[in-house]
């Protein structure tokens, strides 16, 4: 096949994908001779009860999309089930996810609603992603942006505290600054805020995309600190802040798997994670995070 013909078919493939913003590609047609040659999306049907790669990651990305929707709309949708997702064939991937969720914040509402969520990863092996779409399939799409199959941008912070590299872990003295930090010691407080556990699990999923639900279910959060730039604010205001650094102390992770890093092993080892959340006026939600305390591997050359 001539090079021009190949690129023409590649463009036609993405034109068809763009018609549904990447979510419904069952009707996308390509010539049989191009199977396995088109650099496109890999569909995953979660309705079929078979082993599925990235199922845990896809479920967490779906929950993050709902979290973004709830922050924007003031709703209380909760994850129901993962229906399907389409995934870009890259180490740094984009996910186009379809899921069902329930609005438990509205009395008498028991029927599921279908959502679409788009996640674009930015770095391999580390949490750095952006949620650019989180919507119900019944929502009216008022602005149709040009379709780009992998988005490299992110939400823009409005305060220097939340720009650039993630901060180092704060000292005990720094954490005493109540203008910047709110430390949550009470387990009932952070358990009532489901996104704190979600953020931690996303950090671990980003480092190890094949981590299991069993691994995640063992985690025990010990303490949480929320850093914001809104001064003397109430807890709920800090929890709902569009920009925040979240510091989490936790245990019950036997052996962290982080590219090019080595950690002390043991279920009772106290570990630390930092996650930054930024949501801007576009509605984009960007999360960046890392697991602290690792030692960089030294490469040896013979």
From Swiss-Prot:
Modified residues (N-acetylalanine): 2
Keywords: Acetylation
Highest taxon listed in the record's lineage: Eukaryota
Listed Pfam families: protein_MS5 (PF04776)
InterPro entries: MS5
Family recorded in the similarity comment: Belongs to the UPF0725 (EMB2204) family.
Protein name in UniProt: UPF0725 protein At1g23960
Organism expressing this protein natively: Arabidopsis thaliana
């Amino acid at each position: 096949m001539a090079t021009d013909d190949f690129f023409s078919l590649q463009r036609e493939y993405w034109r068809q994908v763009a018609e549904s913003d990447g979510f419904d590609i069952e009707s996308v047609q390509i010539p049989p001779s191009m199977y396995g040659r088109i650099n496109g999306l890999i569909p995953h049907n979660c309705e079929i009860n078979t082993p599925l790669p990235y199922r845990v990651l896809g479920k967490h990305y779906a929950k993050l999309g709902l979290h973004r929707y709830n922050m924007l709309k003031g709703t209380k949708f909760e994850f129901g089930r993962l229906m399907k997702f389409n995934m870009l064939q890259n180490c740094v991937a984009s996910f186009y996810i379809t899921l069902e969720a329930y609005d438990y914040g509205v009395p008498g509402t028991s029927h599921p609603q279908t959502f679409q969520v788009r996640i674009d990863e930015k770095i391999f092996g580390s949490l750095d992603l952006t949620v650019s779409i989180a919507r119900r399939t019944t929502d009216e799409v008022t602005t149709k942006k040009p379709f780009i199959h992998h988005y490299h941008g992110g939400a823009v912070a409005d305060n220097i505290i939340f720009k650039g590299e993630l901060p180092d872990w704060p000292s005990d003295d720094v954490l005493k600054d109540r203008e910047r930090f709110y430390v949550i010691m009470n387990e009932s407080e952070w358990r009532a805020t489901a996104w704190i556990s979600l953020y931690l699990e996303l950090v671990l999923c980003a480092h190890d995309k094949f981590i299991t639900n069993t691994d995640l279910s063992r985690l025990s959060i010990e303490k949480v600190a929320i850093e914001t730039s809104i001064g003397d604010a109430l807890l709920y205001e800090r929890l709902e802040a569009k920009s925040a650094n979240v510091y989490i102390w936790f245990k019950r992770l036997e052996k962290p798997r982080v590219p090019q890093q080595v950690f002390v092993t043991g279920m009772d080892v106290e570990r630390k994670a930092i996650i930054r959340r930024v949501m801007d006026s576009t509605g984009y939600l960007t999360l960046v995070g890392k697991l602290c305390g690792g030692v960089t591997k030294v490469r040896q050359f013979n």
